């Protein structure tokens, strides 16, 4: 809970491990020690939303991403504001959040191990335009109607432990998070929300977990192994022959594993929607000090990582990817 004292994975990969719960963002935090070995904290944190939703047409299921400004049930939905492209904006998309994320945490140090439990509350907002006459038309600037803001409340609970299995030689670390609208707080960045039938942002239920072992065979050598998983549930609906949401079984995945002209252009074909369902990760590595003295410390590290992505089942199956990654690093710490 103390700033810069976080228990983060020792990986070279700066995005750490799938299943690790963290985010890089500004915050205002207050912490109080209520008793020996017991601390309570609360923070207000910079909000942002990870939206993932698709739309397609039955029976073939071809389509693509549902974008801000799209039409649902004859209404225009806006959940992203795009910068004007000047100064530091450069067309960056900013989600329309109206309140900070709130996190509460309790930390316990009873004498053996360190334990934490936390709660998370989030407020997802978008804007919906209902046209006065007939259905709205995407991209039109002459629509007349009534607009309103819709806010959806998300929440999650989680915890973590750090246990000295063999003091000074072997430690166990683990963490987990479960909730609705909590995907952004996992290293894999699965979605928080998708599109709802009324144009609101509909919560995506999900969970994440990670566990690891850290060994110190001798002074100056750290060896680690971690495994993690993140998963979300489907959330979808249909309006006639138009399909919406996340993980809709009517979406087509038919050509995800087929090379097409789109492949060479860096595009995704209309019959490969492949919404992410689950990410898994296994990694091992080490850090060895090669110099430690009056001028600081030099360490050499290496890491192997296996990452698997699994998509929701659609027309044509549930495609997946398997990535094997090797990292090496030399780091100098002057202090």
Residue ranges of predicted features:
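Conformationally flexible catalytic loops at phosphate/diphosphate-handling active centers
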Residues: 61-81, 85-88
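Outer-membrane beta-barrel pore domains and translocons
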Residues: 1, 45-47, 109, 120-122, ...
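Short, solvent-exposed loop/turn and secondary-structure capping segments
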Residues: 6, 53-55, 128, 186, ...
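Outer membrane beta-barrel
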Residues: 1-65, 96-114, 163, 171-173, ...
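Residues on the lipid-exposed face of transmembrane beta-strands in outer-membrane beta-barrel proteins
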Residues: 28-32, 104-108, 157-163, 209-215, ...
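Detector for outer-membrane/organellar transmembrane beta-barrel domains
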Residues: 110-282
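Predominantly the C-terminal beta-signal and adjacent terminal strand-loop region
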Residues: 291-335
């Amino acid at each position: 809970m103390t700033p810069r004292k976080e228990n983060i994975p020792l990986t070279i990969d700066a995005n750490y491990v799938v299943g690790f719960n963290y985010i890089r963002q500004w915050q205002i935090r207050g912490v109080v020690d209520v008793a020996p070995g017991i601390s309570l904290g609360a923070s207000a944190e910079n909000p942002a939303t990870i939206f993932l939703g698709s739309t397609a047409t039955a029976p073939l299921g071809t389509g693509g991403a549902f974008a801000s400004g799209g039409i649902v049930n004859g209404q225009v939905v806006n959940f992203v504001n795009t910068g004007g492209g000047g100064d530091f904006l450069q067309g960056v998309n900013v989600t329309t959040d109206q309140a900070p994320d709130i996190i509460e945490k309790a930390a316990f140090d009873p004498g053996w191990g360190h334990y934490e439990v936390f709660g998370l509350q989030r407020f997802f907002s978008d804007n919906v335009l209902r046209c006065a006459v007939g259905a709205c038309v995407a991209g039109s600037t002459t629509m007349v109607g009534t607009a309103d803001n819709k806010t959806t409340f998300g929440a999650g609970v989680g915890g973590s432990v750090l246990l000295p299995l063999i003091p000074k030689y072997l430690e166990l670390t683990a963490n987990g998070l479960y909730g609705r609208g909590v995907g952004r707080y996992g290293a894999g960045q699965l979605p928080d929300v998708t599109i709802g039938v009324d144009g609101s942002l509909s919560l995506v239920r999900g969970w994440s977990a990670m566990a690891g072992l850290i060994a110190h065979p001798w002074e100056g050598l750290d060896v680690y192994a971690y495994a993690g998983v993140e998963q979300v549930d489907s959330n979808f609906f249909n309006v006639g022959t138009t399909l919406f949401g996340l993980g809709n079984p009517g979406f087509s995945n038919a050509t995800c594993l087929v090379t097409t002209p789109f492949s060479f252009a860096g595009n995704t074909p209309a019959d490969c929607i492949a919404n992410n369902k689950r990410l898994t990760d296994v990694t091992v590595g080490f850090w060895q000090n090669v110099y430690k003295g009056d001028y600081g410390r030099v360490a050499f590290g290496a890491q192997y990582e296996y990452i698997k992505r699994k998509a929701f089942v659609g027309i044509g199956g549930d495609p997946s990817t398997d990535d094997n990654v090797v990292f090496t690093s030399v780091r100098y710490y002057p202090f």
